[in-house]
Amino acid sequence: MIEVGDLKKGMFIIYDGEIYRVLEASKHFMGRGSGLIRTKLKNVKTGLVREVNFPSGDKVPEAELSFRKAQYLYRDGDHYYFMTLDDYEQYALSEEEIGDAKYYLVENMEVDLVFHEGTPIGIELPTTVELTVVETEPSFKGDTVSGGGKPAVLETGLKITVPYFIEVGDKIKVDTRTGEYVGRA
């Protein structure tokens, strides 16, 4: 059991019989009463995000998870296939289990497979990934004066804003936590 005041981003807890990843946790104190811990939790299996407020001092069970290095192999329909690097066993995860991580998966990339009681329930991505720009507006001389950026579509279907100097075919780094452009690869 872990006290809700000690919850941090990235931790896994069990709430309502389901495993959740803590996306945000902040403390709010009211006048005379005890504090309130506001959390944003993501269901590991369904990918749904919900906001839950816990009274300060409450305790929740921490999920017992294990992580194994794996390589993303391919997608077939609604399933994504991974191979663990230690024993070369293959696992399939559904699109629901993968969630938005599907926009960052490139064949042969390494990820961490998340296991609960021997069953894969999700993946952990690296902080940044390299993706190729497949669609964006052409740049014109003087575009950089206004600052900002232009929309771009990446090889995985992810739509982000990139600087004006980025062209179709460029490899760029994208932060998997925020979905934002980091730099050229």
From Swiss-Prot:
Q: What is a GO molecular function of this protein? A: translation elongation factor activity
For biological process, the GO terms are: peptide biosynthetic process
- Main localisation, per the record? cytoplasm
Q: Name one Pfam family in it.
A: Elong-fact-P_C
Q: Which InterPro entries match?
A: Elong-fact-P_C, NA-bd_OB-fold, Rib_uL2_dom2, Transl_elong_fac_P/YeiP, Transl_elong_KOW-like, Transl_elong_P/YeiP_cen, Transl_elong_P/YeiP_CS, Transl_elongation_fac_P
Q: Does the keyword Metal-binding apply?
A: no
Q: Where in the cell is it found?
A: Cytoplasm
Record keyword DNA damage present: no
Q: What domain of life is recorded for the organism?
A: Bacteria
Instruction: Offer a single GO CC term for the protein.
Output: cytoplasm
Task: Cite the entry's keywords alphabetically.
Answer: Cytoplasm, Elongation factor, Protein biosynthesis
Family, as annotated: Belongs to the elongation factor P family.
Q: What does this protein do?
A: Involved in peptide bond synthesis. Stimulates efficient translation and peptide-bond synthesis on native or reconstituted 70S ribosomes in vitro. Probably functions indirectly by altering the affinity of the ribosome for aminoacyl-tRNA, thus increasing their reactivity as acceptors for peptidyl transferase.
State what protein this is by name: Elongation factor P
Q: Which organism is it from?
A: Thermotoga petrophila (strain ATCC BAA-488 / DSM 13995 / JCM 10881 / RKU-1)
Q: What is the lineage of its organism?
A: Bacteria, Thermotogati, Thermotogota, Thermotogae, Thermotogales
